[in-house]
Amino acid sequence: MIPTNDAHITLMNYDDPLEWAQSVTRELENILLQEITQRGRASLLLSGGTTPALVYETLATRPLDWSKIDIGLVDERWLSPQDKDSNAWLVRHTLLEHAKHATFLPLIRPGKTLNQCVHDANLQITHSPPPCAVVLGMGNDGHTASLFPGSLDLQKAINTPQPYVALDATGCPGAGVWPLRITLTPAGLNNIPHRLLLLRGKQKLKVLETALSCKDALDYPIRTAIDLPNARLRVHWCA
């Protein structure tokens, strides 16, 4: 089991998915409210996948001043933002379906190349106040964002000073049929003070336990989020 006094993470356990989603929502709501109070505006980065959808739907019901909140993405598949397999589509049809006044900043821009989209993403995040919070996920292979074990670009993505990079995960099972990606890097994550990792199921907990004992980010890229200084990774796990 994961030790409760681990120096890198704080683990919260839930048996009920609704309780899990409501707890994560309360945490995000408080972070966003504090940021708006202090700075006048807040920015939040979200991940795709099936795990966070319930959280996004719950967060969308909260009475926040969404006109003062920017929503960005942790990573994206090289797809049209209108494609149902894109992370942009997921966020639009869960969170933004109700939080209509939020400003959405997708990573893929129609008519631009992958490298141009990466350039624009880096300009956006570099010349704006840093996001106050990020919602991460993790695959059964230990990947987070689009940092896949076995990717030829992984070491470069881990070492780059750029917040976002393009990554080719050809041959990586976790990437499925969408090997080309834009992904947040450890450098980009390092500037975000509140880092939440959302997990569902016993298999994901076992993967996290293995990653904590492994220590090698090339084998378990989730370690890039675990090992960053300045803030613990807050893990919300539901059985």
Curated annotation (Swiss-Prot):
Catalytic activity annotation: 6-phospho-D-glucono-1,5-lactone + H2O = 6-phospho-D-gluconate + H(+)
Q: What family does this chain come from, according to its entry?
A: Belongs to the glucosamine/galactosamine-6-phosphate isomerase family. 6-phosphogluconolactonase subfamily.
First-level EC class = hydrolase
- Gene giving rise to this polypeptide: pgl
Tell me, what is one Gene Ontology molecular-function annotation carried by this entry?
A: 6-phosphogluconolactonase activity
Please indicate if the UniProt record lists Hydrolase as a keyword.
Answer: yes
Q: InterPro entries, from UniProt?
A: 6-phosphogluconolactonase_DevB, Glc/Gal-6P_isomerase, NagB/RpiA_transferase-like, PGLS
| GO biological process per UniProt | carbohydrate metabolic process; pentose-phosphate shunt
Q: What name goes with this protein? A: 6-phosphogluconolactonase
Q: What does this protein do?
A: Hydrolysis of 6-phosphogluconolactone to 6-phosphogluconate.
EC number(s) per entry: 3.1.1.31
| Pathway in which this enzyme or protein is active | Carbohydrate degradation; pentose phosphate pathway; D-ribulose 5-phosphate from D-glucose 6-phosphate (oxidative stage): step 2/3
Assigned keywords, A-Z: Hydrolase
Q: Which domain of life is it from?
A: Bacteria
